């Protein structure tokens, strides 16, 4: 929410890393992130 780098880069890597889990992680607590 600061620049255009961490915004499209963060969700892109997460989506490819966890796939559909990315959307679930946004609503759920950062369990896989930690």
Curated annotation (Swiss-Prot):
This gene lies just downstream of mgtS on the same strand in another reading frame and is encoded antisense of the mgrR small regulatory RNA gene. This is Protein MgtT. The gene is mgtT. It comes from Escherichia coli (strain K12). Residues 24-34 have a biased composition (Basic and acidic residues). The lineage of its organism: Bacteria, Pseudomonadati, Pseudomonadota, Gammaproteobacteria, Enterobacterales. Induction: Expressed in both exponential and stationary phase in rich medium; expression is higher in exponential phase (at protein level). InterPro entries: MgtT. Residues 1-34 are annotated as: Disordered.
């Amino acid at each position: 929410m600061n620049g255009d780098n961490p915004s499209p880069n963060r969700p892109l890597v997460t989506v490819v890393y966890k796939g559909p889990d990315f959307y679930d992680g946004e609503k759920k607590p950062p369990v896989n992130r930690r």
